[in-house]
């Protein structure tokens, strides 16, 4: 070493290993609450281990990864970090239930320019809360402190989930047929999609996020955590013949419903079967957004759309409502020509 130059450390370069260790200690309790019996070992290993549940005869693993998009920018601006982790889990696990899978474990990636232990602990505690709601284990993760890559207190998160489904019980839309009923399961708000348009509407309209709307502020409506449909969804799948499930995320109705429909079929949606929650009405009015664009960008109050035999529809709605969900018959499956759109909203 040169005697004239100071001795540099990783901390001098902007990476605080001690802060990372402090974060691990802070989140251990939250992570432990999510543990499933299949999980082997604890935090700190190079890899996380998980056995397959023994109840499955022909288990198929189902994986998913997602983020929360620019909803995160809104959370950062409002300094509210405790529910963004729930959003992260929801966006991943809800994609698994679409195929009938039970989530087993979840991993997270948290990246920031300068690690704030309090903020990171809030986010990861939210992830643990989401995992508890979904019944999956938070089995590991990565916290990356990357000076020069993020501005100020900014951070980003990504999630990764693995679930399991019996091979013979995979839901892939192949059983959908003309005459099937379509059931909607209500959302808690925009969930985690369309937030670039949300932020543009806020900017152009100069709206105040503290303005009150139906008993809550606009900001509270917009940061409402994404609903997690795992427990109600698994119960529904166990008791009814589910032909398809569509998770209404980015691309809205027009893009997500066709993903689970076979050729020659279309979803006919009764647009009068529900009233859009007030936040969607507010967004449409403030942004002068066309109804077509609303259905293309937002869930408009519908988190899942489920296809099943018509004679099971009422019982399925009753089951979902008993599980605490808002649910209703929203339409049906009809025959479609090859040149027709696969979604029709009346």
Curated annotation (Swiss-Prot):
Keyword Manganese applies? no
Gene Ontology annotations for the cellular component aspect, listed alphabetically: cytosol
MF annotations from Gene Ontology: ATP binding; phosphoribosylamine-glycine ligase activity; phosphoribosylformylglycinamidine cyclo-ligase activity
Keywords from UniProt, A to Z, are: ATP-binding, Cytoplasm, Ligase, Nucleotide-binding, Purine biosynthesis
The keyword Ligase appears for this protein: yes
Q: What is its EC number?
A: 6.3.3.1
Q: Which Gene3D superfamilies match?
A: PurM-like C-terminal domain (3.90.650.10), PurM-like, N-terminal domain (3.30.1330.10)
UniProt similarity note: Belongs to the AIR synthase family.
Q: What is this protein called?
A: Phosphoribosylformylglycinamidine cyclo-ligase
The organism's taxonomic lineage, starting at the top: Bacteria, Pseudomonadati, Pseudomonadota, Gammaproteobacteria, Vibrionales
Primary gene name = purM
